[in-house]
């Protein structure tokens, strides 16, 4: 079992973990944590109907524990005092910059291997107006004919202690997904 799916953003780590599990006759289990709709995403991916997946995570600035240039972007957002998009793009490059904050996004990449860490879109938002909430929005789009496709958006509002990296309900969601 893997506690932090963000670790799988490193292809070598993922390869070594999967090989070790296979040698022992096991499967590498990745809990979904705060990812709502994980089973539906997986079914769409397996059925070849998943076209796009975007996960947006919005938290108070003090709930982020960031690395590298994202620390500077967060500091600028705090100084400006308003809502700020810290990152928007493919998930893989975000993982080492926010390893404590993007496990839900990483679970989405694992649930949708056809998209993976390079195809899942990630958006990280710092918003001081939500000091005690972590908000996860998952946008799923299917393949479609003539520009018409199924689209599903879910929003999960998780109460959180001010400054907490993990919301109150996430711990229970993690353990219940085992």
At which residue positions do the language-model features occur?
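Active-site-lining helix/loop region of Rossmann-like oxidoreductase modules
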Residues: 26-178
